[in-house]
Amino acid sequence: FLNYRDSGMIDSPTTSNPECFWQANIEEASLRLSNLLCEESVDLLVIYDPNGGYGHPDHIQVHRVGTHWADQTGIENIRWTTLNRDSIKKTIELAIETAPDEGLAGIGDDLEERRQRVEEESFGSAESEITHAINVSDFIEKKRAAISSHRSQIDEDSFFLKIPNDQFVNIFGTEWFINPKESRKENETFKSNLFD
């Protein structure tokens, strides 16, 4: 966090803490990033998309600070990590259909709320905007454990922790990225190397 505090979600009182990352001055945070990376030879910078993935203030700030730092240092090879809005929407719709059969009765309101949230343009990115897809399904159990331990973002009764493994893989088995300097043509396959 470049020695800033976690901001919490946008509606949390912690976002008004002057020591949290959300409140950080972009120039100052960029200088801290520069000090951290001064001995590195940066070939590629990976930051969040402008939405911060799902709207987390710290993720949005990572985008702002990283973009500013790249502009100041002349780094042109940037990738935005994002969420595939279309893929998540399909998985949520499948979960709504199969919830009773999968023993997930009682999470219908959570699923409906998430379906509506995924419809918003401030959540992730449309698949048509995504240029890179990296298969990380070999690490799915580690990802599930990491998400489960991230209590400031995920409640223990969250849909994401209750869905069957195949649906979890649909959402989290691929990492999605955007090259903001190019677009993917219709029907063109996703690139699988961030340096391409």
How should these model regions be labeled?
Residues 20-22:
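The substrate-binding groove and active-site-proximal loops of carbohydrate-active enzymes
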Residues 14-15, 24-196:
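Metal-dependent de-N-acetylase/amidase catalytic core
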Residues 1-11:
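A conserved beta-strand->alpha-helix junction
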